[in-house]
Amino acid sequence: MGRKIFVSYKYADNRVQNLRNAINSTVRDYVDEFISKVNSADDIYKGEHDGEDLSNLDDNTIWEKLKDKIYDSSITILFISPGMKENFKEDRDQWIPWEISYSLKETSRRDKNGNSVTSHTNAMLAVVLPDENGSYSYYLEKKTCCNEECRTHHTDRLFRIVRKNKFNRVKNSDKSVCHANNTIWKGTCSYIEAVKWSDFINDYSKYIDLAVDRQSHLDEYDIEKEI
């Protein structure tokens, strides 16, 4: 049985590494590359918009624009890119936070027979795209923490709702605090785990399966669903 995947991304962001021999690649090109790899039985819903202004739209209007794509999906993949977040705009005035919020919420609608059907919180995954220089360090950076190698997530680059679902495992987590009050997490620590594009595209099913496994343990995470 195929999976229904919703992809959330900043469609026009061109601050990414060019794919193969292409020039002026955008995040949309990475989405197309992913789509070309997936099983034909899987359905992909793209959260693509043409820059429509959200500032004058109420919550219900935004939901009407997104519901058909998100409601039927069970997995949401966020493509993180250097220009994903427009810092001069509020989160509520950008599409991605709404897409993440509705992916996490349990929402109800009527089926063709008039029966109320409720969707469940989607499995979630973030894929970090390389910047123009092929580096991931704008978000994922290798460092030394507490005398051992670690990887720092620059969560200040994220929307609030995504940031709140990072390092939010409250049950069965493996973390410690060392000098300078650095908190070191080991293993699975976030509902929205992040993976580099180069790893994801070579074995995307593995990372989607891991996201589905986290979904089956929702009670272990403090899920933030509001923008």
Regions found by a protein language model. Name each.
Residues M1-I75, K196-D199, D203-I227:
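Conserved N-terminal substructure of TIR/SEFIR domains
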Residues K4-F6, Y11-Q17, P130-I227:
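C-terminal interaction surface of TIR/SEFIR-family domains
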Residues N14-S25, E86-I96, S137-T144:
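Short, flexible/disordered intra-domain loops and linkers
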Residues D58-K67, I100-N115:
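Short secondary-structure capping micro-motifs at structural edges
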Residues T76-P82:
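Short, compact, well-ordered microdomains
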Residues P82-G83, T107-R110, N115-S135:
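Short beta-alpha junction loops
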Residues G83-R109:
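Conserved TIR/SEFIR loop-to-helix hotspot centered on a Trp-containing motif
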